[in-house]
Amino acid sequence: MAYNIPERYQDLTPAPQLDKKTLNKMVWLSCFLQASFNYERMQACGWLWGILPGLQKIHTNKEDLKASMAHNLDFLNTHPFLVTFVMGIVLSLEQNKAETSTIRSVRISAAGPLGGIGDALFWLTLVPITAGLTANIAMDGSILGAILFLVIFNVAQFAVRWWLMHWSYGLGTKAVTMLTSNAKEFTRAASILGIFVVGGLIANYGTTSLRIVVG
C-alpha cells in the first residue's frame, strides 16, 4: 500500500543547526549517490542514504522522519559531483520544517541545472586541464603522470563537494536563486575555458602530415 506523504510535518519547531561533523559525514556519503542507480528513480536511493544522517538529527518525531524519508525517495537525477549543493539546500528547508511540497519542488529546481554545469565544470574544464598538466609526464613513460591525474582530479572534485555542502546549507533557498540566475553564464564560461585548453593541447602535442603533389 502506498504511503501518503503529509503536506506538513507534525513537529513544526525548527531544529538546531547541524554540526560540521554531520555535514562532513554526508559529504563522504554523497560519493555513493549512484551506488543504487536504477531507471525508475535514478539516484533516489543514493540520495536518501547520503542525506539520512541529517534527517535523523532534524526529525526527532518518528512520523516526521518517515514522511521525510518517503519524499526524499522521489525521482532524482543530478550531477554526482555537485549533489551536495542540493543536499545543503534541502537540509536547510528540512531544518526549518518547510512544507513537504515546497522541499520537493526546490529539490527538483536545484538538481536540474547542475547536469549541464557539472559537465562543463568537470568534463570540459577540469579533465582537459588536468590531462594537459600530466600528459607530458605520462608521455615520457612515467606512471607518475597517471597517478597525478587521479590525485588532482579526485582532490578537486571532493573539495567542491565539501565546499558546496557547507555553502549551500548556510545560504538555504538563496543558493537556488544564485544558481538559476547565473547557470547559463557559468556553463558558457567553463565550456570556453575547456575548449581553449583542448586547443592548446592539440597545438602542443598534435602533429599533421600533408603530402602535396605538383604537376
Predicted feature residues:
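Soluble N-terminal domains of membrane-associated systems
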Residues: 1-102
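Membrane-helix interfacial "entry" motifs
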Residues: 18, 22, 104, 108-116, ...
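Hydrophobic alpha-helical transmembrane segments of multi-pass membrane proteins
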Residues: 35-38, 117-121, 186-190
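Transmembrane helix-bundle signature of multi-pass membrane transporters/permeases
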Residues: 72-73, 112, 150-155
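Hydrophobic alpha-helical transmembrane segments and immediately flanking/interface helices
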Residues: 98-106, 209-215
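Transmembrane alpha-helical segments and their cytosolic interface motifs
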Residues: 105-136
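Membrane-embedded alpha-helical modules
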Residues: 137-215
